[in-house]
Design a protein with these regions (language model features):
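C-terminal domain-boundary segment and adjacent tail
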Residues: 20-31, 73, 196-273
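A cross-domain feature marking catalytic cores of carbohydrate-active enzymes
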Residues: 40, 67-69, 91-93, 130-133, ...
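Active-site beta->alpha N-cap acidic-glycine motif
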Residues: 6-100, 106, 110-117, 124
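Alpha-helical scaffolding within the catalytic cores
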Residues: 21-24, 49-50, 72-84, 134-141, ...
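A short acidic, helix-capping loop that chelates divalent metal ions and anchors anionic groups
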Residues: 97-102, 192-198
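CE4/NodB-like, metal-dependent polysaccharide N-deacetylase domain
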Residues: 53-62, 88, 104-150, 170-189, ...
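His/Asp/Glu-enriched short active-site or ligand-binding loop at hydrolase and phosphoryl-transfer sites
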Residues: 135, 141-177, 222-234, 251-255
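Short low-complexity, flexible loop/linker segments enriched in glycine and/or proline
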Residues: 79-82, 105-107, 166-169, 239-244
Length: 273
């Protein structure tokens, strides 16, 4: 029965993918410029965010950083460094819990608290929100919009969240998927138990090397990294699509738990725990 319900929800999700832009999340940018948008989640983090910033600076690139309140509280100076370097800051959440497992009221309370705290730290409004795991229900999306932010997902990934691949594979996959206006997912941190996440070990990788090589590959294609705000300021237009988790809550919870167990078991087998 669970599989039947799941398949039915997937069918509805495919219909929603073709829904009008008015109910969509930002997924890319239509731009006349040779720009793509590097985005970084889960920071700011000492030893990781500075490496990412060095790589961006080496290629005269800017990026959008989706930060966690749990990380910002411990690393306010890094947040200031990001802004001073010309990067853009959006909210990733007060923590890294799945919004799809929260009630609409819990989502609103959590997102409002994170937005208020981040705006106090920045002294400026926060426009962008990226749901942890990109996981949002329709009601969660409505709460985000009601709080004056736009939900931002991604069109391709660097695979830096995957502990089972190396940088050569990450770079190859990321550069192959690059195109004008793409929003690319990177990380400058790793959400863990204190952040409400339990997704296995942090991937051991050289983040400077990864970002540097992806940006170099982009340059070979005539592309340069720009934050979402910078891409829009240069004449870009937001492209949105419906991106929602429609799986019923009880089944959704079981599926998330199953994926976590599988990841942890694979990590243990690989000697990563």
């Amino acid at each position: 029965m669970a599989d039947v319900v799941y398949q039915a929800k997937l069918a509805v999700m495919r219909v929603l993918e073709k829904a009008p832009d008015a109910i969509g999340s930002v997924s890319s940018v239509a731009t006349p410029q040779p720009h793509f948008v590097p985005t970084f989640d889960d920071g700011p983090t000492p030893g990781r965010t500075p490496d990412v910033m060095r790589a961006l600076a080496a290629h005269d690139a800017t990026a959008t950083f989706f930060v966690l309140s749990t990380s910002v509280r411990a690393n306010r100076s890094l947040l200031a460094e990001l802004v001073a370097a010309g990067h853009e800051v959006g909210l990733h959440g007060t923590d890294h819990r799945h919004l799809s497992l929260m009630s609409p009221g819990e989502v609103r309370e959590s997102v409002y608290a994170g937005k208020s705290e981040l705006e106090d730290a920045l002294g400026a409004p926060v426009r962008w929100f990226r749901p942890p795991y990109g996981d949002q229900t329709v009601s969660a999306w409505r709460q985000i919009e009601a709080l004056g932010m736009q939900s931002v997902i991604w069109s391709s990934t660097s695979h830096d969240w995957n502990p089972f691949v190396d940088n050569d594979e990450r770079v190859a996959k990321a550069t192959a998927a690059l195109k004008r206006g793409a929003i690319v997912l990177f990380h400058d941190g790793h959400a863990s138990l204190p952040d409400g996440a339990d997704d296995g070990p942090e991937p051991q990788l050289d983040r400077f090397d990864l970002v540097d090589r992806v940006l170099a590959g982009a340059a070979e294609q005539g592309l340069v990294g720009r934050s979402l705000g910078d891409a829009l300021a240069a004449g870009g237009r937001l492209v949105t699509r419906a991106h929602f988790n429609l799986v019923p809550a009880p089944l959704n919870r079981r599926l998330i738990q199953r994926r976590r167990k599988a990841t942890l078991a694979r990590a243990a087998e690989a000697g990563l725990l």
